[in-house]
């Protein structure tokens, strides 16, 4: 794992493939987080307790822009079963999955217990409210607050 200055790694953090993780300066990954995919985390970021970043087995990447945060319990998925085809399990190699990178631009924030599915490009300045669900390929506008299930724009954000 490569990391910059002032990096703080909490207790009981699991990083399954540290060789696929890069972290900038002034970053904190809090207790009880689990990272099992490729990650590029910018500077001045925080990942709060209980956050889970998973899927893709190194083929896909989670990228977090500088000055961004993930609140407690956020789940970022780079791969997921589509739950509409024959088998609903992750243990069988022939299962059709939804897969893709997830990118958060600079100055973004994701609220507590939100779920972000594969294949999302979240632009600069977007915030996502607590308990929100972001389906694959959702189209965001920069500097906007989103929330809900289904997710929807709430209002513009100050720069």
Identify what each model region corresponds to.
Residues 1-10, 159:
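Membrane-proximal basic amphipathic "stem/tether" segments
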Residues 7, 71, 108, 129-136:
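Short, highly charged low-complexity linear segments
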Residues 11-23, 28-121, 144, 149-150, ...:
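Flexible, glycine/small-residue-enriched loop-and-beta-strand segment within the central core
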Residues 113-126, 132-136:
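Beta-rich strand-turn-strand
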């Amino acid at each position: 794992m490569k990391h910059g200055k002032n990096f703080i790694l909490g207790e009981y953090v699991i990083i399954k493939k540290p060789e696929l993780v890069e972290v900038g300066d002034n970053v904190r990954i809090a207790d009880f987080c689990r990272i099992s995919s490729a990650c590029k985390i910018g500077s001045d970021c925080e990942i709060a307790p209980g956050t889970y970043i998973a899927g893709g087995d190194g083929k896909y990447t989670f990228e977090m822009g500088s000055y961004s945060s993930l609140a407690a319990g956020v789940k970022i998925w780079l791969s997921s079963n589509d739950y509409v085809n024959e088998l609903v399990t992750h243990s069988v190699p022939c299962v059709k999955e939804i897969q893709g990178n997830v990118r958060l631009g600079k100055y973004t924030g994701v609220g507590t217990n939100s779920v972000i599915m594969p294949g999302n490009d979240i632009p600069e300045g977007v915030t996502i409210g607590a308990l929100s669900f972001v389906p694959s390929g959702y189209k965001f506008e920069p500097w906007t607050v989103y929330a809900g299930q289904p997710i929807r724009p709430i209002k513009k954000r100050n720069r």
